[in-house]
Amino acid sequence: MDASTKTKKGAGGRKGGPRKKSVTRSTRAGLQFPVGRIGRYLKKGRYAQRVGTGAPVYLAAVLEYLAAEVLELAGNAARDNKKNRIIPRHVLLAVRNDEELGKLLAGVTIAHGGVLPNINPILLPKKNEKAATTTKSPSKATKSPKKA
């Protein structure tokens, strides 16, 4: 056999052929989050002696869903405040106003998020008194200038 007639072995098989483009597990699962990296973290973290092949795919899908949910709500909060850019304040408002996400992230502090606006109902003026005082005040004000 001549060295010139030899073809390089590739993914095509024994005879060689064009090298096929590798397909990531994230692409196969239709995800944006990195399945391989999450699998590596699961192994490196020693959460269990062995990690199944489906575990990092499932975890990546769950993380991607949660991220998409938070971003969707934060984007809505930014639009409500007439802003084009999501800031930590919008993330906090989105998470705290959503019942399920608020329960999931109850013990989480979001840096530069601030607090939810809240006034205790006891401190607010009563509607009946406010309506009564506003109707009486203008009538007295109109009578007093006529004296002079």
Curated annotation (Swiss-Prot):
Q: Tell me which UniProt keywords the record has, alphabetically.
A: Chromosome, DNA-binding, Nucleosome core, Nucleus
Q: Where is the composition biased (Basic residues)?
A: 1-23
Q: Which Pfam families match?
A: Histone, Histone_H2A_C
The main location is nucleus
Q: Where is the composition biased (Low complexity)?
A: 131-142
Concerning InterPro entries, the annotation shows: Histone-fold, Histone_H2A, Histone_H2A/H2B/H3, Histone_H2A_C, Histone_H2A_CS
Cite a GO CC annotation.
Answer: nucleosome
Report the domain of life of the source organism: Eukaryota
Q: Where is this motif: SPKK motif 1?
A: 137-140
- Say which family it is in: Belongs to the histone H2A family.
Tell me what this protein is called.
Probable histone H2A.1
- Gene source species: Medicago truncatula (Barrel medic)
